[in-house]
């Protein structure tokens, strides 16, 4: 969180982050010094004390803060009793900040709360702005989307939630929109940033609205951009596209067969989200070392709500190579490996990596290929990573998409502290209703005829997506998919005049209603 806020404050001449915690001050200072080497214009000040003590909050002048971030002391994999106590402490901390402000308007507060009930309570506790993040809910919905899109979507999300990449901003020109502007028109009024949706005067967030939707004078556009300083609105179109038609072949949603390994606090939510996205005829198979009572009740509930999707709960020794082989991993479209929890982050990642190695060994043996690109029998492997230092090991295990869980949550919290409405955008983005992010084949947008490649300006890609009632945020270049230095082939919001040579294997990153 500190690292993200330092990045966000780079345009400030003198910024400060004040940390109040019960830890020893010297210990906190050492941890910060050991892990962060670049502070730019930001001063980091630590103070040891009880976070709910009003005198301590007055000493750090909490009432004058630009925003307040309240960290939850219990990790999502800890026992329920521990999480309940930690949530109560967060609620008490919110009340203490309100008290410091004497009931007047307080700074925006962003906090992490495990219980949905307590989350609702936190957000309605005062007249001020309180945004409560449920780590399990956010990550579960994100993981479910990774299973349904082409490889690389996690890289897009990583870029979106971090201040060192691209973010979304709420933008309205000082002198207004100039009248008679539709959302479709607005897309070509920005050169190297892209409108994703509208924040209207009623407070509604609408992602990928109808291209005919008029932009009212008080509306803000939700702009995906590298920085707010790079957002420039032009009164006239910056690009005149020539694309007037797109391929007309109808793409039907295809059924998926997805395996989920381990039952965690996220599994039930991931299952529910997958059911809400998947077409009929799809199959979801959960594999665990030891079945839990809630698994069958979850299956029963989902079967009633989604009778056209087959759901199974299977018990097997996930540490045994023979048992994993009987699972026939090569016959799944996607395999989600969830981190079951543990004493330390290193222990949790070690478990996931060892399981990945076993699955990879089976896939190589059964498909006769060394990587997924060499065989159609190689499913998409998706996993959680707790420590970003382990990413390279994970990638060498054959993983196509990964999520650094702790990092994602920290980055979102930092982003919401800078722009509270960002959480509303994420909530909308991760719902089955409306539009979500997908990476779709270039052939959905352009007719290649008999050509292996076509060369087009990025603005034509934007226009082709517009004709499909979509918004695109960038491209995926297949040739660079294995290159970490090239963001695994992901190119986000290039200039509309920049030309790209696209092949049938390349993709467009689209904000769309479904995967077709």
Protein language model regions, located:
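Cytosolic regulatory regions of ion transport systems
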Residues: 1-516
């Amino acid at each position: 969180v500190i690292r993200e806020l330092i990045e966000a404050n780079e345009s400030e001449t003198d910024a400060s982050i004040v940390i109040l915690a019960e830890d020893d001050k010297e210990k906190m200072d050492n941890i910060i010094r050991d892990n962060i080497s670049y502070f730019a214009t930001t001063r980091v000040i630590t103070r040891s004390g009880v976070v709910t003590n009003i005198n301590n909050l007055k000493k750090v002048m909490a009432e004058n803060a630009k925003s307040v971030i309240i960290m939850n002391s219990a990790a999502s994999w800890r026992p329920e009793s521990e999480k309940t106590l930690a949530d109560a402490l967060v609620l008490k901390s919110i009340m203490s900040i309100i008290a410091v402000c004497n009931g007047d308007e307080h700074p925006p507060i962003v906090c992490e709360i495990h219980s949905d009930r307590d989350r609702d309570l936190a957000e309605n506790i005062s007249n001020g702005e309180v945004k409560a993040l449920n780590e399990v809910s956010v990550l579960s919905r994100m993981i479910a989307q990774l299973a349904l899109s082409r490889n690389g979507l996690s890289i897009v999300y990583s870029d979106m939630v971090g201040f060192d990449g691209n973010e979304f901003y709420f933008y309205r020109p000082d002198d207004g929109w100039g009248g008679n502007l539709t959302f479709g028109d607005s897309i070509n009024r920005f050169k190297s940033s892209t409108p994703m949706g509208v924040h209207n005067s009623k407070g509604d967030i609408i992602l990928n609205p109808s291209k005919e939707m008029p932009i009212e004078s008080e509306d803000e556009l939700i702009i995906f951009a590298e920085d707010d300083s790079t957002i420039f609105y032009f009164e006239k179109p910056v690009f005149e596209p020539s694309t007037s038609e797109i391929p007309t072949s109808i793409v039907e949603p295809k059924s998926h067969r997805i395996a989920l390994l381990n039952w965690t606090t996220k599994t039930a939510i991931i299952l529910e989200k997958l059911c809400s996205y998947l077409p009929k005829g799809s199959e979801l198979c959960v594999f665990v070392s030891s079945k839990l009572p809630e698994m069958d009740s979850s299956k029963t509930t989902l079967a009633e709500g989604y009778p056209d999707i087959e759901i199974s709960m299977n018990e097997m020794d996930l540490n045994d190579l023979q048992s994993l082989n009987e699972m026939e991993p090569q016959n799944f479209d996607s395999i989600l490996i969830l981190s079951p929890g543990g004493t330390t982050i290193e222990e949790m990642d070690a478990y996931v990596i060892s399981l990945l190695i076993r699955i990879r060994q089976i896939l190589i043996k059964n498909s006769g290929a060394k990587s997924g690109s060499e065989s159609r029998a190689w499913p998409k492997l998706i996993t959680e990573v707790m420590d970003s230092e382990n990413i390279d090991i994970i990638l060498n295990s054959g993983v196509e998409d990964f999520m650094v869980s702790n990092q994602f949550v920290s980055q979102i919290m930092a982003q919401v502290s800078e722009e509270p409405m960002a959480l509303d955008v994420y909530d909308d983005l991760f719902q089955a209703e409306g539009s979500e992010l997908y990476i779709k084949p270039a052939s959905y947008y352009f007719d290649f005829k008999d050509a292996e490649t076509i060369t087009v300006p990025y603005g034509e890609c934007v226009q082709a997506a517009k004709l499909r009632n979509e918004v695109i945020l960038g491209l995926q270049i297949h040739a660079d998919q294995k290159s970490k230095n090239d963001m695994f082939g992901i190119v986000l919001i290039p200039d509309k005049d920049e030309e790209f040579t696209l092949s049938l294997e390349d993709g467009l990153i689209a904000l769309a209603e479904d995967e077709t």
